[in-house]
Amino acid sequence: GEAIIQMMATFVLMDRDSRKVRAVDPEIVAPYQSDFSKKLLRGPKYPDLENPVSKDYHVRFYDLDMNGHVNNSKYLDWVFEVMGADFLTHHVPKKVHLKYVKEVLAGGVITSQYEQEGLKTQHQISSDGHINAQAEIEWEEVEEKGWTYGK
């Protein structure tokens, strides 16, 4: 009975042609007997990064989903990968807040940035001068798992 993950998600309906958010028709919601609410649940505010560690990554074909956007799981890869093997060998995420801001499309380069203060890191994924995702992670130190990366 121990909770190992808690998730908050907000979903919207998007018009594929105009790429704009549109209202959900009441008859679509009715079968689910769900209350209608215009209120959006929001996660934490993410601070601007002042002096981040930064690494660029090329967006590859296999990073994409069927809509031609980068798959959501890839953002976490970029967030973790920039931390480096030495850190990741001795730390595991305890709490992750991840906000998807703007989709990343095929081709091009993204920049993964982070700043660390103690066991807390702030992250930003950006491309073409736009923020695509932001994250805040609380880490827990762990014993090395009996192997050393690259040795």
Residue ranges and their predicted role:
Residues 1-43, 104-106, 115-151:
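HotDog/MaoC-like acyl-thioester-processing domains
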Residues 57-141:
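Acidic/His-leaning functional-site neighborhoods
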Residues 15-92, 142, 146-151:
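Hot-dog-fold acyl-thioester-processing enzymes
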